[in-house]
Curated annotation (Swiss-Prot):
Record carries keyword Plastid: no
Native organism taxonomy: Bacteria, Bacillati, Bacillota, Bacilli, Bacillales
Pfam families from the UniProt entry: Flg_hook
GO BP annotations, alphabetical order: bacterial-type flagellum assembly; bacterial-type flagellum-dependent swarming motility
CDD domains: T3SS_Flik_C
Gene assigned in the entry: fliK
Polar residues bias spans: 300-311
Family as reported in the entry's similarity comment: Belongs to the FliK family.
InterPro entries: Flag_hook_Flik, Flagellar_hook_control-like_C, FliK-like_C_sf
Source organism: Bacillus subtilis (strain 168)
Residue ranges of the region described as Disordered: 144-163, 286-311, 447-487
Protein name stated in the entry: Probable flagellar hook-length control protein
Amino acid sequence: MKLLELAGPLLQTTTGSAAKNMKSSQGVFQNWLMSEAGLKELSEQGKGTPNSEDQLLADALKKIGEWLNASPEDQDKQNADLLQTLSKLTGKQLDANALQMLQNLLQAVESKMSGGTDQLLTETEKIFSEAKTALSANDSASDINGALKSDKEQSNQENEVSEPAKELIYIQMFISQLVEGNKLTDLGNGNEAHAIYQNGDQFLSALEKKGVSQQLIQDLKQQIFTKAESSSKLYSMTASELKSFQSLMDQMSMLPQKGTKEWSLAESQLKAFLLSKSSESSQDFGKSVLTPLSQSSSSKNASDVSGSIQPVDSKSGLQMLFSGYRGIGGVQTLDLQQMSSDIPNAETKTVADQVINAWKQMKYTPFGRSTGSFTIRLNPEHLGFVTIKLTNENGMFQSKIIASSQSAKELLEQHLPQLKQSLPNMAVQIDRFTLPVQSGDQPIYGQLADEQKQQQEGQRQQRQKKQSNDFGDLLDEVSMVEMEEEE
């Protein structure tokens, strides 16, 4: 600002060696600033009766509010007290309300300084105008020199910064320091994120030596260890996320080799972590999740099974997405036809793509520690349904994909390599994939094409009777939970 430029000589003569160290030590700058403003050093602030952090902040906000509501004349009288108040906030973690109050104070101070500058510039223009008049009215050199000397003296007098103006300069600088300091604290985890990023090459090299898939390494490079450090998602993580990721890196680096149970679990967690970060920025499925399936195994037949998509917040979405978190496994139904309005050209997607997209939508088992199943209705309708079951036997995950029609099964078999490669990267490590032929003890979900109904109705009823007790109990449990929620 122009007022700061006018006050430049004053600031230059008072900074001394403290200004040289301003970049390397914020405390040195604050001490110098308070000494120039006539305040005590930071080291002396602790004397007297100590107040709690909350009380200190409340008193400071009250003082700032009083200054903002005061008249211009009273504000000038309160400048010194305001400086003392701001000095007490040095090094404190400020909440959003306090930062907003400081922003309001900064705007008010800058507005006040801007008003004083405009007045000062007006007076300066008036002086130069009078000087021109004097030059044109006087022919002698002595008269001209006298006029210039008089004008120079008047200009110097006008350029002198008043005491309230100097205090406003200090207040402005103090507020800027407090706001910037808290911005660094909020980004706060920048040092931790930078430290993790610096170890990225070493971590990736260790993973390559242990035979980790190139797809996983590529995902790490695209999301975490990017070419441009500022693009890394490390800087958008919370402190707890950074701590978890660092712990996961350390664990995988210390494990002797790939193939152990511990390694499989750690690798599953890493893939789930990357998936969660990828899904946060994805716009394809992030705005909607599934509502729980409401049915019983005895009273509702398969033609009544359908899912719906409703927007919910992320916290409730996790609970609704996967009923397996109740501890007994779960069943979810995904209606891809209802999603067709959100997904362009859904009919043109392959069966494998539909399964993969459904897996994404489910955010299935975020940390690879839950089991269950969910059902997908395929597009077009005559393909019927596909059920994906995930089980955990002795710490090893297994996935079974059950097709309700022969045509869907054949299409899935054609794309089985793609499924094997893609599904584990979505959330969990799959140790064994099976795609069995439809048998009598496997349920069929949904309504088949018209030409298949009559032939398969009798078979469907027989298959329903032969469902396993565990699966029937599971559906009963889900139904009971949903009925309780409706009541």
